């Protein structure tokens, strides 16, 4: 079996990219004879980390049909149309070179791989990790209905990472019978546990961007320290964005320098997360709650928004808490509740129990293999 994946990301800081890395590892472990190829947009850490498992790779920049809402204009549409022909041609050339049995686009962000596969008469599957309408950080460059129709028509199967995403796209796509849910793996191998006697610490893992909601965590911490001045917030995933600069200003303005620690993007985030007493998620939306599972696998209760992606994994008071994302005050109350509860050690054990024998690389790979070997009507 020869499989060709199309990746829109070059770094390993996104859920879709980390999913691809785990999937490539798992497939190679489960089916050593299979040949796996990936088209990356550029040479970077994702290429470096997946390379040991690949039979080949190519670097082809594929234009996106998902853009920031403020950049949805005729100029962007023109630029996409100008770039797509070259990208399709290069992708078709690579498909002819390696002759894959199946191709898989690992994102909703670009249709180039699907279009090229269709032109070369190669079966194509789409692995969708995004729901733009709900995330609101990206939007379709062209008419949403026409894009969704292309997704249906250019795919023999459409994979999604959660039951919630499956229900959403069942109501959106013209061929809902093509949809399969496959829960991805989350590999966590942290080095050490919390140091005895350290201040109560909340860990938050995620790239610094508005949808991830680091600003909400800071607003909540501002309230928490009024009651518990020693509470610490560990933010993992820092970058040099304008949003990150705004967070820095807010931390200074609120006099929280002694309470907030920032760790830049790292390929080993769990070594930091496991130092916390609990994990926090402030995302407005997640197609799959990967960061929630990461917290649970680190043995941490997780405080998450009271939304479908949180409700699917967290049971109130058992392995975490749910809160109203529109209210930093409600989040502050849940953090204080976690500090005051006498059941924190028990909740940590429950966190591990709730993901025991779940979300493993071997299971992910076998589920994926079963799906791609199945016949769609």
Predicted regions and their residues:
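A short, well-ordered alpha-helix in the C-terminal region of glycosyltransferases
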Residues: 343-358, 367-370
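Conserved acidic donor-binding segment of nucleotide-sugar-dependent glycosyltransferases
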Residues: 316-317, 321-328, 337-342
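Carbohydrate-associated surface elements
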Residues: 164, 185
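A conserved mid-protein helix/loop that constitutes part of the nucleotide-sugar donor-binding site
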Residues: 14-25, 200, 207-226, 245, ...
């Amino acid at each position: 079996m020869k499989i060709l994946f199309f990746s829109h990301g070059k770094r390993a800081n996104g859920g879709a990219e980390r999913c691809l890395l785990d999937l490539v590892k798992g497939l190679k472990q489960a089916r050593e004879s299979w040949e796996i190829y990936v088209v990356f947009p550029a040479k970077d850490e994702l290429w470096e980390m997946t390379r040991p498992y690949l039979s080949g790779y190519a670097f082809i920049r594929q234009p996106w049909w998902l853009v920031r809402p403020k950049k949805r204009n005729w100029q962007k549409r023109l630029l996409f149309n100008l770039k797509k022909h070259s990208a399709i041609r290069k992708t078709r050339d690579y498909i002819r070179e390696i002759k894959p049995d199946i191709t898989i686009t690992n994102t909703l962000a670009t249709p180039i791989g699907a279009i090229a596969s269709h032109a070369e008469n190669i079966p194509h599957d789409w692995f969708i990790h995004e729901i733009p309408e709900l995330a609101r950080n990206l939007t379709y460059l062209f008419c949403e209905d026409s894009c969704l129709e292309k997704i249906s028509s250019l795919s023999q199967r459409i994979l999604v990472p959660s039951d919630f995403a499956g229900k959403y796209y069942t109501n959106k796509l013209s061929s809902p019978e093509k949809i399969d849910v496959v829960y991805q793996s989350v590999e966590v191998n942290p080095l050490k546990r919390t140091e005895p006697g350290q201040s109560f610490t909340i860990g938050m893992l995620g790239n610094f961007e508005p949808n991830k909601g680091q600003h909400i965590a800071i607003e909540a911490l501002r309230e928490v320290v009024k009651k518990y001045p020693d509470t610490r917030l560990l933010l993992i995933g820092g970058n040099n964005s304008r949003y990150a600069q705004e967070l820095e200003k807010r931390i200074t303005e609120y006099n929280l320098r002694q309470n907030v620690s920032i760790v830049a993007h790292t390929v080993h985030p769990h070594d930091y997360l496991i130092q916390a007493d609990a994990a926090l998620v402030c995302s407005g939306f997640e197609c799959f709650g990967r960061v929630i599972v990461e917290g649970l696998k680190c043995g941490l209760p997780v405080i998450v928004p009271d939304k479908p992606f949180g409700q699917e994994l967290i049971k109130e008071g058992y392995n975490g808490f749910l809160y109203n994302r529109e209210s930093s005050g409600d989040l502050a109350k849940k953090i204080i509740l976690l500090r005051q509860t006498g059941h924190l050690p028990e909740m940590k054990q429950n966190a591990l129990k709730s993901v025991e024998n779940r979300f493993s690389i071997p299971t992910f790979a076998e589920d994926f293999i079963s799906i791609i070997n199945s016949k769609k009507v």
